[in-house]
Every structure is written in C-alpha cells, then in structure tokens.
Amino acid sequence: MEKLIKLVGFWLCATIIILGLMGCDRLIGNSGDVVERVSDGDTIVVKDANGKNITVRFACVDAPEIAHTNKEKQSKISSDRNQFTWGVKAQERVQELVQQGGDRVTLNITDSDRYGRKVAEVRLKNGTFIQQVLLQEGLAKAYRPYLNKCPSKDLIQQAEAQAKNQKLGIWSDTKFVNPWEYRALYKK
C-alpha cells in the first residue's frame, strides 16, 4: 500500500509540474502583442490579448514618410523620392526587427494621439528597443516636441547623437528633409 501511495504521489507531482511548465512556456514564449503589420517606419498594428487590432505609433521618434498613394509612388519630385526612399528603409528595418523578435512586441504605452493611435515605446521579447535601433542606424529622428513624454528620453537622445556623429543613414544625406518638415511643406 505504501508503494502505491508513493507511486500515485510521484505521478501527481509529475503531472502538476508538467502542466505548470506548459503554462509557463505559454506565458513566456508568447508574451507580448502579435504584430499584424508594419505600416511604416514608426507605426505598427498589433493584435492585443483580446484579438483586437490596435495601431501603435512609436513614441519619441519620427521616421521618414513612405508613399501611400499611386501619385506619391510615381512622383519624380526629388524631395518626395528622397523621403520615400528613407521611409522604405526604415519600414524594412522595423519589419526585420519584428521578424527577429518572433512577430511579438512589448508595448509601454505613453499616450494616444489625435488619430486614436496608441503611442508607445516598443520592445522585442529580448528587450531590444526598436526606436533606439532606428535612431542608432540613422533611420529616424528624435521627435523633440514629445520627448518629455518619453520614459527613455536619455537613450533616445544618445542614440540619435551617435548616428549624427557617425553620419549614419539620414545624417549622411544633405538633401534629407526632417519628416515633420516634409509633412508641413509637401503633404498639404
């Protein structure tokens, strides 16, 4: 009888441990929100825990614009082509990072914008801060009007300074127009 009790106890403990580990794997392995698509260099759409799609604008940074309309895609205007070329590079880099992170991100939502998008610091499961990478590689600029709402303000400024000093990405392009200036001048 004692042998039977030990055997049942062993299997009961083993079952509890296995079920517990399966639950932990689900929580750890699939943590974060699923990225449905990368809209551009500073905007993604994620599916939250309830299955709802949420548009997320990256906090603290502004990436170059991408062409949205056929007219923009066919534009021969040099400022358009320049902006859109850098915009596509930023978008592709975000797509690459998201794929490396298993199509999941962790959001630190800091605000909502006038378009109803959530504004957030976006990190991969391994902790990689996407905005920091974009800035370090010269694929975005710090968006100064909103830096005070940015919990990682110091990291943002350091990453941008690093790219600027090394003349990486947009910092190497003397014809590049800041995204906010481009929108004000050309997107009316």
Regions found by a protein language model. Name each.
Residues 2-12:
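Bacterial N-terminal signal peptides that target proteins for export
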Residues 13-19:
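Sec-dependent N-terminal signal peptides
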Residues 22-23:
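C-terminal motif of bacterial Sec signal peptides marking the signal peptidase cleavage site
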Residues 26-139, 143:
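Electropositive
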Residues 148-188:
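N-terminal targeting pre-sequences for secretion and organelle import
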